[in-house]
Regions:
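Glycine-rich anion-binding surface patch
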Residues: 1-79, 84-93
């Protein structure tokens, strides 16, 4: 965690413009699609992750928009937080 305010909001459906993985066995895909918004120092990035049902620790990031103005440490904190939120939701389902 950095000095910046870090907020992750997870919601049950993917944001417009994102789609789940289409390769592989769809029955093995986790039903919960994780759309997330991370806000760091007033800058917002969007990410959408899917987890494999058989490997909840394997989070597949479909998109993460980086702002070059955000320091690398903050980007790392956002990726770690997104990963942790996704894993927790994956375990709960």
């Amino acid at each position: 965690m950095t000095d910046h305010d870090l907020m992750i909001k997870a919601f049950g459906s993917a944001p417009e413009g994102f789609s789940p993985l289409t390769s592989g066995d769809d029955s093995q895909r986790l039903q919960v699609k994780l759309g997330m918004t991370a806000s760091v120092g007033g800058t917002t990035v969007d990410a959408c992750c899917w987890a494999d049902k058989t490997k909840p620790m394997q989070i597949i990031t479909k998109a993460l928009l980086f702002d070059p103005a955000i320091p690398d440490d903050d980007l790392r904190a956002m990726r770690e937080s997104i990963f942790l939120v996704a894993v927790e939701v994956g375990r709960a389902t």
